[in-house]
């Protein structure tokens, strides 16, 4: 490979050299890379090899429709050439190359969208190894190089050289060196303390670690010495050449020459007499070794691949530092042929549900040729955490994004991928420990799938895990719940809320827990959306215990008692409804309360208190929806509670008792809070509570206080009793 080794000494003739300034953000990024200490500088080689691979992908892709593009060089490969004498490491590829405009734009004057984002990430403590994800991997060369020269030849342009020592500017000139044919050569002039990257062992280690599955041969060229047995004539020629090199050392040069001549004659005589006489000399040669002989892993038989190999491939594919959690390797044959390798990561990325960010988690190949890596049509959004490759035999190689959207083949591939992902999750669920890790990270995705994917809703519902009133610290499946249901239980009961403790202590679950009925605790906001779509499981309806019309398993005697209570408290319910007016739709006797005097439930198709809270938190909420979805509140009273019984007696004794009205409003507002709703006017409620505290402490309401401001506040407080003009209770909305 003489052309690669010679080009480090480019002849600097009088050709025109143009100087350009780096775009501000790029200059800033380079300064950051050069002036900050990073321990894992080795990633520069991964990034440059990755860029070479992309360039080779491009020329291969173009050659599929126009084979003449490869006339400038049929072989597609990457060569690595370390040169210890010149302290340079050269990366050569026979990819698409760059035109002069490409050189100027791509390497310096036009900032990539990721430049700023990467700098912000770096300053926030991100790892330098993430550089490739932001599209600025080339600049990682300056981690180890003081100067970088890029020589490139594109089919449509002349050969150009780009050079920069990162001082805020770079030069571009026509290159008059060795013609390349086509491709790009990146020459790194290494810093004095970075010569380890010229060592054969170190280069092999980095390529194996980061670039083992690159689809093109990566060949390392190393100059080595070996012993060679030669006859004395050849040895003499070799010695003569060495003498010429050492002409500066002239001391006693004549004597050895005379001796040599004599010895030569003697040797010739000996040689004629004894031809077996040989001599060993050191010979330099260039050793070529292909570093990535492993073929694309997804084309191999899954039975022949070890978990370590899958792990290595996963890391090279995703740049993840952790191993994958689970893997699915399969091929589909028949009318449609494709192979796929899918991985579940150990943890969810921090921006998993950022819609604006295009995910590039599944790479699409067609007959081993890379096509694209952010193909949104390949997998539904709720599975956007799955990483891997899909290699199709049937898609056309020159397929565009628009064609992909219409492609029936892609729809079939997508359907198969979803099916296999669900199989993978079901297999994972058999390993309790690993499934727990998976569920912690990706439960939201499963629930989003239930909301969005009606076809696979049943399978996805089997993957759900929840805490329940009977499960303690373990999460259980809906199937587990069904196996523990009581004989006469027809429904699956659930409650939604913010935390496990909050829902466990809720008034709504009192009677269910007393009767030994298990209640599912749904404590993630997405659960509200999930149960809107998941109406039933294995023929059992899912019923919210916070909504009206709760049916509990009860015998005839219990039903009779309940009817009697309804009749007894019918009058109180009517009085309370008249006092609360439009605040509630109706007041009824409850069958769900044990220790609480009352609670607020919502209509069957309205929002729960938790959903109302979630919707109020939406910045872009639709207030018209809020109006009709959140308005339907029902007050349920506990007929067995002493407060309610005393209130009934008080109301029946005197229908116009003002304290009844005050107490009903106080009960309603307290029930709102305990049922998870928010108060429209918390201050008035607070004043009412302070007044109750005063009564409890025996402080007379009319006592003048030392502080005038306190007196003013006291005057504003609504009295517990009084006529229509003075009672503020009536004004509370």
From Swiss-Prot:
Region named Interaction with FNIP2 and TSC1: 285-621
Q: Where is this motif: TPR repeat-binding?
A: 724-733
UniProt modified residues of type Phosphotyrosine: 314, 493
For bias kind Acidic residues, which ranges apply?
230-246, 256-269
Give its localization.
Nucleus; Cytoplasm; Melanosome; Cell membrane
Region annotated Interaction with FLCN and FNIP1 sits at: 285-733
Family matches, as Gene3D superfamilies: 3.30.230.80, 3.40.50.11260, Heat shock protein 90, C-terminal domain (1.20.120.790), Histidine kinase-like ATPase, C-terminal domain (3.30.565.10)
Citing just one GO molecular function, the answer is: protein tyrosine kinase binding
Q: Where does the chain bind ATP?
A: 51, 93, 112, 138, 401
> Could you tell me which residues belong to the region Essential for interaction with SMYD3, TSC1 and STIP1/HOP?
729-733
Q: Residues bearing S-nitrosocysteine?
A: 599
| Enzyme Commission number | 3.6.4.10
Keyword annotations for this protein? Acetylation, ATP-binding, Cell membrane, Chaperone, Cytoplasm, Hydrolase, Membrane, Mitochondrion, Nucleotide-binding, Nucleus, Phosphoprotein, S-nitrosylation, Stress response, Ubl conjugation
Outline the segment boundaries, as ranges, of region: Interaction with NR1D1: 629-732
| Modified residues annotated as Phosphothreonine in this record | 5, 7
How does the record describe its quaternary structure? Homodimer. Identified in NR3C1/GCR steroid receptor-chaperone complexes formed at least by NR3C1, HSP90AA1 and a variety of proteins containing TPR repeats such as FKBP4, FKBP5, PPID, PPP5C or STIP1. Forms a complex containing HSP90AA1, TSC1 and TSC2; TSC1 is required to recruit TCS2 to the complex. The closed form interacts (via the middle domain and TPR repeat-binding motif) with co-chaperone TSC1 (via C-terminus). Interacts with TOM34. Interacts with TERT; the interaction, together with PTGES3, is required for correct assembly and stabilization of the TERT holoenzyme complex.
| Domains: entry comment | The TPR repeat-binding motif mediates interaction with TPR repeat-containing proteins like the co-chaperone STUB1.
Q: What does this protein do?
A: Molecular chaperone that promotes the maturation, structural maintenance and proper regulation of specific target proteins involved for instance in cell cycle control and signal transduction. Undergoes a functional cycle that is linked to its ATPase activity which is essential for its chaperone activity. This cycle probably induces conformational changes in the client proteins, thereby causing their activation. Interacts dynamically with various co-chaperones that modulate its substrate recognition, ATPase cycle and chaperone function.
Q: Under which name does UniProt file this protein?
A: Heat shock protein HSP 90-alpha
Originating species? Macaca fascicularis (Crab-eating macaque)
């Amino acid at each position: 490979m003489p052309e690669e080794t010679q080009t480090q000494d480019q002849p600097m003739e009088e050709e025109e050299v143009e100087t350009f300034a780096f775009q501000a953000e790029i200059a800033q990024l380079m300064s950051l890379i050069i002036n900050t200490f990073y321990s894992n500088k080795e990633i520069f080689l991964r990034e440059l090899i990755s860029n070479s691979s992309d360039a080779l992908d491009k020329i291969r892709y173009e050659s599929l429709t126009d084979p003449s593009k490869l006339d400038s060089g049929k072989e597609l490969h990457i060569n690595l050439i370390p040169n210890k004498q010149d302290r340079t490491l050269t990366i050569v590829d026979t990819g698409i190359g760059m035109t002069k405009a490409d050189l100027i734009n791509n390497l310096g004057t036009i900032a990539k969208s990721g430049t700023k984002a990467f700098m912000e990430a770096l300053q926030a403590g991100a790892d330098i190894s993430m550089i490739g994800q932001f599209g600025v991997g080339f600049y990682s060369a300056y981690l180890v190089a003081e100067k970088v020269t890029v020589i490139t030849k594109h089919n449509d342009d002349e050969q150009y050289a780009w050079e920069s020592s990162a001082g805020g500017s770079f030069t571009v000139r026509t290159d008059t060196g060795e013609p390349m044919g086509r491709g790009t050569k990146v020459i790194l002039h290494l810093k004095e303390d970075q010569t380890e990257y010229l060592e054969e062992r170190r280069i092999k280690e980095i390529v194996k670690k980061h670039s083992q599955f690159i689809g093109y041969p990566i060949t390392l060229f190393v100059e080595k010495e070996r012993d060679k047995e030669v006859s004395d004539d050849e040895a003499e020629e070799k010695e003569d050449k060495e003498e010429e090199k050492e002409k500066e050392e002239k001391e006693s040069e004549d004597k050895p020459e005379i001796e040599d001549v004599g010895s030569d004659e003697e040797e010739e005589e000996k040689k004629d007499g004894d031809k077996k006489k040989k001599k060993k000399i050191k010979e330099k040669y260039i050793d070529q070794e292909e570093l990535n002989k492993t073929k694309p892993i997804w084309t191999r038989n899954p039975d022949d691949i070890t978990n370590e190999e899958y792990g290595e491939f996963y890391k090279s594919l995703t740049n993840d530092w952790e191993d994958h959690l689970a893997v699915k390797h399969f091929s589909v044959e028949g009318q449609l042929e494709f192979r796929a390798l899918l991985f579940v990561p150990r943890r969810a990325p921090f921006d998993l549900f950022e819609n604006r960010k295009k995910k590039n988690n599944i790479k699409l190949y067609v007959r081993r040729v890379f096509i694209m890596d952010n193909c949104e049509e390949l997998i539904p959004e709720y599975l956007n955490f799955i990483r891997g490759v899909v290699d199709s035999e049937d898609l056309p190689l020159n397929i565009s994004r628009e064609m992909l959207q219409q492609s029936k083949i892609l729809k079939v591939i997508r359907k198969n991928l979803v099916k296999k992902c669900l199989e993978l999750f079901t297999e994972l669920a058999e390993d309790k420990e690993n499934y727990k890790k998976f569920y912690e990270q990706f439960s939201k995705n499963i629930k989003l799938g239930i909301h969005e994917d009606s076809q696979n809703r049943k399978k996805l519902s089997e993957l759900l895990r929840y805490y329940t009133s009977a499960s303690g610290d373990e999460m259980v499946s809906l199937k587990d719940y069904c196996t523990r249901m009581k004989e006469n239980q027809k429904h699956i009961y659930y409650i939604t809320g913010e935390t496990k403790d909050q829902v466990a202590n809720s008034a709504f679950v009192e009677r269910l827990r007393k009767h030994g009925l298990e209640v599912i605790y749904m404590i993630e906001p997405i659960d509200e959306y999930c149960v809107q779509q998941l109406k039933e499981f294995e023929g059992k309806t899912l019923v919210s215990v916070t909504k009206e019309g709760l049916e509990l398993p009860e015998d005839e005697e219990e039903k009779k008692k309940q009817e009697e209570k309804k009749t007894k408290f019918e009058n109180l319910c009517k009085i309370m409804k008249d006092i609360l007016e439009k605040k509630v739709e109706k007041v009824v006797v409850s069958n769900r309360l044990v220790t609480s005097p009352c609670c607020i439930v919502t209509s069957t198709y309205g929002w729960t208190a938790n959903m109302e809270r979630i919707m109020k938190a939406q910045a872009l909420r639709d207030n018209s929806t809020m109006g009709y979805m959140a308005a339907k509140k029902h007050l349920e009273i506990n007929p067995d509670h002493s407060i309610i019984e005393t209130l009934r007696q008080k109301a029946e004794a005197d229908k116009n008792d003002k304290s009844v009205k005050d107490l009903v409003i106080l009960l309603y507002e307290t029930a709102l809070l305990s049922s998870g709703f928010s108060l429209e006017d918390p201050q008035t409620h607070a004043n009412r509570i302070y007044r109750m505290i005063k009564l409890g402490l025996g402080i007379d309401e009319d006592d003048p206080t030392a502080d005038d401001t306190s007196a003013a506040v006291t005057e504003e407080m609504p009295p517990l009793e009084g006529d229509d003009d003075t009672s503020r209770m009536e004004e509370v909305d």
